[in-house]
A protein has these predicted regions:
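Domain-length cofactor-binding catalytic modules of enzymes
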Residues: 1-189
């Protein structure tokens, strides 16, 4: 993992990551932040994608596009990937928790009173997990998407100048219980 992960815990990062105060239609104040694993997850993914590409060639597994290389479940390489993946996802979760704690403290100090936190919604937007779909247990990757199980709350961040949203999942089977995580990018990173 990144040698700087300890210094990165509790930090926002760049790109489309942000912290903001929002008002909803009832004038309720929301502390909203959008961030992730600070690049650690991407580095882990690149490492394991390179391993998958080598294994595809070694095992003579034909694939139409080298970018579709995969790790075979049950292999040591797959196990290593899942272990690293869970570490990165936990780091991203704790990173957002730490920032939200700091945000709440700063807002309390600014307002001169305690902030009443009613609920906290912390959701991944780039991740993989085991789920049940259409009677099968699968490894589902959501890239730029959030879990939209029926009743589950999620966040859809806007872009500069557009609103962010708290949404409730509908559990749509056709979308694999997924929803877009944001407006997307105009240009590639």
């Amino acid at each position: 993992h990144s040698p700087k992960w300890r210094q990165q815990l509790g930090s926002l990062g760049g790109g489309n990551h942000f912290i903001e105060l929002c008002l909803d239609e009832t004038d309720t104040v929301w502390m909203f932040l959008h961030s992730g694993s600070r690049g650690v997850g991407n580095k882990i993914a690149q490492k394991h994608i390179a391993i998958a590409k080598k294994l595809m060639a070694k095992w003579w597994i034909p694939i139409e596009n080298n970018d579709l290389a995969y790790l075979v479940q049950g292999t040591p390489e797959f196990g290593s990937y899942i272990k690293d993946l869970h570490w990165a996802q936990r780091f991203a979760f704790l990173n957002r928790e730490e920032m939200m704690d700091r945000f709440s403290t700063c807002l309390s100090e600014f307002m001169g009173t305690d902030v009443e936190e009613v609920e906290r919604i912390n959701c991944h937007h780039n991740y993989t997990q085991r789920e049940e779909h259409a009677g099968h247990t699968v490894w589902l990757t959501r890239k730029g998407a959030v879990n939209a199980d029926e009743g589950r709350l999620a966040l859809i961040p806007g872009s500069m100048g557009t609103a962010s949203y708290v949404v409730e999942g509908k559990g749509n089977d056709q979308s694999l219980h997924s929803a877009p995580h944001g407006a997307g990018r105009r240009y590639s990173r």
